[in-house]
Amino acid sequence: QYNNAGPYLLGVLIQRKTEKNLIEYLTPRLFDKLEIKPLEAEFCPKGYVFGAGGLQMNVRELGKFGQLYLQRGKWKGEQILSEKWIEESTKKQVECGDYNNSQVDGYGYLFWHLKGDAYMANGKYGQYCIVLSDQNSVISVNSPETEQSDRVGRYIMKKLKEGRRNNGKE
């Protein structure tokens, strides 16, 4: 079942092993290559990056991240993430838990698996990066939500469902 402990512990392990926090570790390997900077993140009281969230990106940067996944880990001719990682991280690994959305059918490694050939990463205040592989599309959204809510996500999912129904893909 989904929870935030796994991604948090991954960040802790990376920092202990490399002596660099998660952002410092990922910057030359991922963020610099995608031209995403400067990055801000939330830290826990013990000094570790909160690996399950708190990463701040604008909508264009979020879209680049989604495009990297849509392109199976390849960016400007370089394989930044392995295709195997893309495949494993975006497929259903565990049940959704209490995430109540009719378009979500499971959780992968940091991604929600959606019905059809689609998946998304989302933030607690209305940030979404949705990859629609079957439509060769990425949708990135930064909304001004001030409360932890999935109102924006529900609206997006409703419109995607309507679009798929109209295109005969549901």
Please provide the spans of the model-predicted regions.
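A beta-strand-loop signature enriched in Asp, Gly, Thr, and Trp
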Residues: 41-50, 72-97
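Catalytic-site signature segments of enzymes, centered on catalytic residues
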Residues: 1-53
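Active-site Gly/Thr loop motif
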Residues: 38-40, 86-139, 146
